[in-house]
Amino acid sequence: MTTLATLIFLVTLLFVLWQPKGLDIGITALTGAFIAVITGVVSFSDVFEVTGIVWNATLTFVSVILISLILDKVGLFEWSAIHMLHASKGNGLKMFAYIILLGAIVAAFFANDGAALILTPIVLAMVKNIGFSKRAIFPFIIASGFIADTTSLPLIVSNLVNIISADYFHIGFIRYFSRMIIPNLFSLLASIIVLWLYFRKAIPKTFDDNNIKHPKDAINDLKLFKISWIVLVILLFGYLISEFTKIPVSIFTGIIAFIFLMLARKSNALNIKQVIKGAPWNIVLFSIGMYIVVFGLRNAGITLILAKILEYISNYGLFSTILGMGFISAFLSSIMNNMPTVLIDAIAIGQSNVHGMLKEGLIYANVIGSDLGPKITPIGSLATLLWLHVLTQKDVKISWGTYFKTGIIITIPVLFITLIGLYLTLIIF
C-alpha cells in the first residue's frame, strides 16, 4: 500500500506540473483521487473528510480572486501603481521600493496569485513606457513576482496555503494575524534589502517621470472605482466578523464577490462573463483531488515518518523547531509544489507528539516555508508557472536556470529572517 500510495502521488504531481497538452490541473488531481479511491488507498469517508477540510479554503480563495479581477478591470491597481511612480519623483531606487510595497499590500488583501498575475503586467508596461532597458526591467519583474509570495503571510486570505493550514488547525482570523504580522514585516524588510542588494547595479538611479500619465487616467469606471473602496472596507469587516461568529469566511467573501459582480454587470469597463471565467475554479477541484491523494500517503503511514522527524527536531527547542520546519517545508515546496507540501506537513504536525508553543511554531513555520519556498524553483507553485507563461507571452523570457539562480540566492536569507520574526513573536507575545 505504501508503494502504491507513493506512486499515485508522484504520478499525479508529475502530470500537475507537466500539464501535457494543456491538461487541466483539476482534472489531473481528481483522476489521481479517483485511482486512490478505487485501489483502496483512501476510503469514501476520507473523501468526505477532505471535502469538509478544503471547501472553505478554496471558495474563499476563488472569491477573493474574483474581487481582485474586478478591481483590476476598474483600474484600481494601475491607479495605485501610477501613484507609486509619481511618489518616486524620478528616483529609480525609490520606485523599486515603492513597487515592492504596493505588491506587499496587494498580496496581503488579494492573495499572492492576484498580486503576481495582476500587478506584474502593470509594472512591466510602466517600466517599458518609461524607457527602461531589458536589464533594468528584469529587477522590477522579479521583485513583483517575488514579493507576492514573500509577503503573503499576514492574513489568512493572503495565500491558499494560509487558508488550508488555518482551517486544518482551526485558527481564527485575529489569532492568525497576531502571529504572522511581525514575520510578514520581517519578510517585507528583508525582501526589500535582499532584492536591492542583488539588483542594485541594474536598477536605474533616475528616470524621466514627465511622461507618466495621471492616476485618474487609469480609472476605467469612476462610479465602480468609488464603490471598490466600500467593498474593501466591507471585506475587511467580513474577515473580522467571521472570527467572532464562527461563520466560514467563504460565506462572507462569496456574498461580497456576488454583490460586486452584480454592481459591475452594467459597467463598460469589464465583461462579467470573462471575469467569472477568469477565476481559478479549477483550484477547487485541484485542492480536493490533491488532498485526497495526500490522504493516501497518510493512510500508508508515510506522514508518520515526517511526524517523527518533527518530534526529533522539537527536542532541541523552539528556535530549532521553527528553523527546521521552515526549511523542510521550503525545500519540499521547491521540489514538489507548495500545495501538497502544506497538506503533508499539516497532517504530520497533527500526528506528531508535539504540543504547546512548539506545535504552534511548527504550524506557522510550515506556512512560512510553504509560502516562501516556492520562489526557489519555477515548479514551487502553480502561480509561478503561470506567471512565467504570462511573461513569455509579453516577450519577457526567463529561463528556469536563471529563475533558479536568482530564486535560491534571494529566498534563503529572506526565509531565515522571516523565521526569526516568527521566533521573536512566539517568545515575546
Curated annotation (Swiss-Prot):
The chain crosses the membrane at residues 3-23, 25-45, 50-70, 99-119, 137-157, 180-200, 222-242, 244-264, 275-295, 316-336, 372-392, 408-428. It is found in: Cell membrane. Its main location: membrane. Coiled coil: none annotated. GO terms for molecular function: arsenite transmembrane transporter activity. GO terms for biological process: response to arsenic-containing substance. NCBIfam families: 2a45, arsB_Sta_pI258, PRK15445.1. Involved in arsenical resistance. Thought to form the channel of an arsenite pump. This is Arsenical pump membrane protein.
